[in-house]
């Protein structure tokens, strides 16, 4: 796949996660909480954990969409001669894939802890179906995030770094000739 296609996949999954997947899980947690007569301490902690996770994931996505993805798009534009040397220099002088990656964190693993806690929890009969739904949602989202992370870490980032290196060589050659 081209880098443009991979970038499109990353952006679309970000939108899907924020607009659909996270809301579905949050709704299931709300239904679970409401299914108990009294507040269930584990569910309240789970809800708090999930809201914090949702916020961290949104921050992670915003950082990628504010820095990493536009930077890669700029590299692609320069490669296709859609931006000039000055614009390329402005874009890259304070940025690099290495700098961006130093600020990049993995948020995929936290869902496993949440799911494992749920699996080990005793439920009452009226909420078993909701627990199973939530566990299935978490497993599915966890797998989806794993694939998303692998595409970023093993395809997008190495190819973007290679493109950056190639363009830096071209840029260095241009400077030598001028």
Specify the residue positions occupied by each region the protein language model found.
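Small-residue-biased structural context
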Residues: 1-178
């Amino acid at each position: 796949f081209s880098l443009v296609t991979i970038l499109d996949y990353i952006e679309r999954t970000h939108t899907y996660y924020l607009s659909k997947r996270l809301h579905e899980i949050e709704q299931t947690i709300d239904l679970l909480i409401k299914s108990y007569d009294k507040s269930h301490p584990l569910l309240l902690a789970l809800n708090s954990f999930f809201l914090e996770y949702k916020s961290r994931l949104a921050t992670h996505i915003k950082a990628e969409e504010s820095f990493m993805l536009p930077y890669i798009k700029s590299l692609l534009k320069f490669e296709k001669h859609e931006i000039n040397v000055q614009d390329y220099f402005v874009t890259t002088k304070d940025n690099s894939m290495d700098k961006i990656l130093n600020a990049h964190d993995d948020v995929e693993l936290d869902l496993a802890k949440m799911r494992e806690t749920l699996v080990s929890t005793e439920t009452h009969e009226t909420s078993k179906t909701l627990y199973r739904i939530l566990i299935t949602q978490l497993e599915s989202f966890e797998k989806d995030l794993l694939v998303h992370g692998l595409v970023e870490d093993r395809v997008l980032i190495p190819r973007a770094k290679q493109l950056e290196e190639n363009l830096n060589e071209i840029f260095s050659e241009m400077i030598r000739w001028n």
